[in-house]
Amino acid sequence: MVKVVKVYYDDEVSMDILKDKTVAVIGYGNQGEAQAKNMRDSGVHVILGLRPSGSSWKRAEKDGFEVYTIEEAVKRADIVHILIPDLVQPKVYREHIEPYLREGQALGFSHGFNIHYKQIVPPEYVDVIMVAPKSPGKRVREKYLEGFGVPALVAVYQDYTGNAKDLALAMAKAIGCTRAGVIETTFKDETESDLIGEQLVLVGGLIELIKKGFEVLVELGYPPELAYFEACNEAKLIMDLIYERGFTGMLKAVSDTAKYGGLTVGPKVIDDHVKENMKKFAERVRSGEFAKEWISKADKASEVLEELMKPIEEHEIEKVGRFIRKMSGLER
């Protein structure tokens, strides 16, 4: 059964609940900087909670924010919005946030991983909400400055005060997301669909599809540069068309030859066997097996990722890609 979602827009959401409240954004990276700036520009009192030795402290001060240690920011805040990487969140939460929480505060997240997989277990006397813009931080900020916004997801995990949903929607509006539209979801659905999408398509599947297409062309004797153009470079053009017009709009924009070849051969390459394989790995996410595996590597995540990236970094497609990007003026 397909779930029906509720979408909220700008004129349906009030920011009144944020009046006289302080939002402490924990972290000043990709999302932290964008969300903090947008909320501040929307009239919300925003402070930053950062490590004193961190490089982002001075940058946040330069950007005009009040910056405190994480502990002090939590003490001063009504809403503690945690925007640091998934694997470091539990330790930071246990040591620097949880001991200073008080009744009626709210914990905010932009990804449900640690709540859904019980790496963070909040006390019962706080609200727990999620506001998850569906774009990188840079675009979240750019679209806000253009007078628009990016779509977002909102969810409530724990509603101690009875106002958690209104709070999440108000924060989404302050970030600019209700200008585009905000979809109500759950921590479970956001977390699992995000991980499944990353692994099957956006990061895992896409890289392997492009890489294997490149390898086939090269193995058949075509120059690597031509292979790169056909398997990788032009993928952006197609994705831009899909992003702007959908599948049908993209197909109407390409040549009839490309259309016929793609529609007749594509389903035979990405066939039901591939779909079944996708379902198998989606179940690893749904069962918690993937999370358990990734969490077990938390202490050595950098080394693990470095090792996993080596074959990609050393692949011929990367060497050729650098050459093509220089030709295109994208790299020096």
Curated annotation (Swiss-Prot):
GO terms for molecular function: ketol-acid reductoisomerase activity; magnesium ion binding; NADP binding. This is Ketol-acid reductoisomerase (NADP(+)). It comes from Pyrococcus abyssi (strain GE5 / Orsay). The gene is ilvC. Signal peptide: none annotated. Mg(2+) 1 binds at D194, E198. The keyword Repeat does not apply. Pathway: Amino-acid biosynthesis; L-isoleucine biosynthesis; L-isoleucine from 2-oxobutanoate: step 2/4; Amino-acid biosynthesis; L-valine biosynthesis; L-valine from pyruvate: step 2/4. PROSITE patterns: KARI_C, KARI_N. Substrate binds at S255. SUPFAM superfamilies: 6-phosphogluconate dehydrogenase C-terminal domain-like, NAD(P)-binding Rossmann-fold domains. Residues 5-185 form the KARI N-terminal Rossmann domain.
